[in-house]
């Protein structure tokens, strides 16, 4: 890096920070924090626990955003000031030190961008994720299992907790269906980028002739619906089936028909849960899954109506990413346009940067 490149980087980062500032509105956040602090002084503040909890959650969220913005803004300002001073004094040591730190400064602004992109109403919620293999039998079942493992490894890396709600093993390998809930900060904000069709191209380990196969799996992601969100579901619109828990449902597999499958007739949405020995608990969880799916469906309808996203980007049937393992190795995301050669690392859960690339690309198009 030379002085011209560094100066251009500072200009780019300064513009980014200013653009983020126009969205974040730090002065408005400071004013809102003062409002909340005044409300907290009320002796009756904790009488309404739900309201107090919501305000505390809001306070933490906007305080964190303000701190990140202030830190990034100050970092760019300090770097600019120090660079100008070092140039005026021909201080090569300081200039080289700034060059070496350029990557860290750039990453700080990217992290601020991501924080801003994950500040949506539902981004902070837990995520309910379902993976369904496409046509292709064992090959597709195995691909669904590979995706499931990729997400589990990603959750381990990021400190998300995972609870499997339903797991149905494939007949020869892989899985026929899996649903799980991801719990943690911005779980839905990250996982919403995985909503869509995932395509795999590889030499099949199940083909004795070693031919190339293409497999598909769909990933569906919904925000876990809070109890305070009302979604009306009429009993007449539901078809409820019970069945025996099977496969890798875990230690709770038993001989009673405790597993629940609920079909929402008007939309055709199907949810399943076999996580618990209790049919009653499985039904409650399945209903929560259904509410989350219906909530997500309504959000997508609103987005489509407002034209905030292209129609092709909305549905769960949209192909979002290709994973090519043969004849070359590359993962390409159709939304960001980015291609990655570290296929092994990605399938081992190293997908954070790829997801963040999608979030940034989608914001740029909005």
UniProtKB/Swiss-Prot annotation:
* Record keywords, A-Z: Cytoplasm, Methylation, Protein biosynthesis
Assigned protein family: Belongs to the prokaryotic/mitochondrial release factor family.
Matching entries from PROSITE patterns are given as: RF_PROK_I
| Species assigned in the record | Campylobacter concisus (strain 13826)
Q: What is this protein called?
A: Peptide chain release factor 2
Where located? Answer: Cytoplasm
List modified residues, type N5-methylglutamine.
251
Name any one Pfam family assigned in the record.
RF-1
Q: Which domain of life is it from?
A: Bacteria
**What does the function comment of this entry state?**
Peptide chain release factor 2 directs the termination of translation in response to the peptide chain termination codons UGA and UAA.
GO MF annotations in UniProt: translation release factor activity, codon specific
Q: How is it modified after translation?
A: Methylated by PrmC. Methylation increases the termination efficiency of RF2.
> Cellular component terms, GO, for this chain's entry?
cytoplasm
Tell me which SMART domains the record gives. PCRF
